[in-house]
């Protein structure tokens, strides 16, 4: 997808989310989630899940596009894919590998899995934006996606924290996450080593964003619709 098409898609998503925010956060008597006279708007669990699913799917699409763009421009003929298997910094976190495994996990545990993975990406996404600028002839398509993903990952994390507070009010969160130590690899002088570090990070981001997207859709079905979907 070219930059113009991506920009149009991003703009449409932001308009959708903005409209959702306006509709949900005005104290209008016709909206049951905001009773008449309420000082603070309380967004329903269903609406929180709707937003989270939209965001997670958007992030996964951007991650896939960014990985494909990087692979096409920098990784052809270098054999990176064979070295990238099972070398993600989040591999230390126990996560279900497929839908069948995820269905066996209690929703509270699955919510915590999502929080841990999202928190584990805060630091690498911040540095990814900075280091991508130093790539030789780095295309705007990669940089713009990196910036967008970092911002939307923060929004999704905030949304997930609100969901957890509604599903389990009063429960104190355990802020567990996997520490990323890959910054020196993104700054290596050897070009092949540096490009592989970028490739591996983007490969892992695509993998984890797909997992989160799948887990969220499963949780929405289970919690909001009582598995009747």
Curated annotation (Swiss-Prot):
Pfam families: Hormone_1. Keywords: Disulfide bond, Glycoprotein, Hormone, Lactation, Phosphoprotein, Secreted, Signal. One of its GO terms (molecular function) is prolactin receptor binding. One of its GO terms (cellular component) is extracellular space. Disulfide bonds join 34-41, 88-204, 221-229. It is found in: Secreted. Residues 1-30 form the signal peptide. InterPro entries: 4_helix_cytokine-like_core (IPR009079), Somatotropin/Prolactin (IPR001400), Somatotropin_CS (IPR018116). The keyword Secreted applies. Its main location: secreted. PROSITE patterns: SOMATOTROPIN_1, SOMATOTROPIN_2. Glycans are attached at residue 61. The modification Phosphoserine is found at residues 56, 64, 120. GO terms for biological process: cell surface receptor signaling pathway; female pregnancy; lactation; mammary gland development; positive regulation of lactation; positive regulation of receptor signaling pathway via JAK-STAT; response to nutrient levels. Prolactin acts primarily on the mammary gland by promoting lactation. Belongs to the somatotropin/prolactin family. Interacts with PRLR. This is Prolactin. It comes from Felis catus (Cat). The lineage of its organism: Eukaryota, Metazoa, Chordata, Craniata, Vertebrata.
């Amino acid at each position: 997808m070219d930059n113009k098409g991506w920009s149009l898609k991003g703009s449409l998503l932001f308009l959708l989310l903005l409209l959702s925010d306006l509709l949900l956060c005005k104290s209008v008597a016709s909206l049951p989630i905001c009773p008449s006279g309420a000082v603070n708007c309380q967004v329903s669990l269903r609406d929180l899940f709707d937003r989270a699913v939209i965001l997670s799917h958007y992030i996964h699409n951007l991650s896939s596009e960014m990985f494909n763009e990087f692979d096409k421009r920098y990784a052809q003929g270098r054999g990176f894919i064979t070295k990238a298997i099972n070398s993600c910094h989040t591999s230390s976190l126990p996560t279900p590998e497929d839908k069948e495994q995820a269905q066996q996990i209690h929703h509270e545990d699955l919510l915590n899995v999502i929080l841990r993975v999202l928190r584990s990406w805060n630091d690498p996404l911040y540095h990814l934006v900075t280091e991508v600028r130093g790539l030789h002839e780095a295309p705007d398509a990669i940089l713009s996606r990196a910036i967008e993903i970092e911002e939307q990952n923060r929004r999704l994390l905030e949304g997930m924290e609100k969901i957890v507070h509604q599903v389990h009010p009063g429960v104190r969160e355990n802020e567990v996450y996997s520490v990323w130590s890959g910054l020196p690899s993104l700054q290596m002088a050897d070009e092949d080593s540096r490009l592989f570090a970028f490739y591996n990070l983007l490969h892992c981001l695509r993998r984890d964003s797909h997992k989160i997207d799948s887990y969220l859709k499963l949780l929405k079905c289970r919690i909001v619709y009582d598995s009747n979907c």
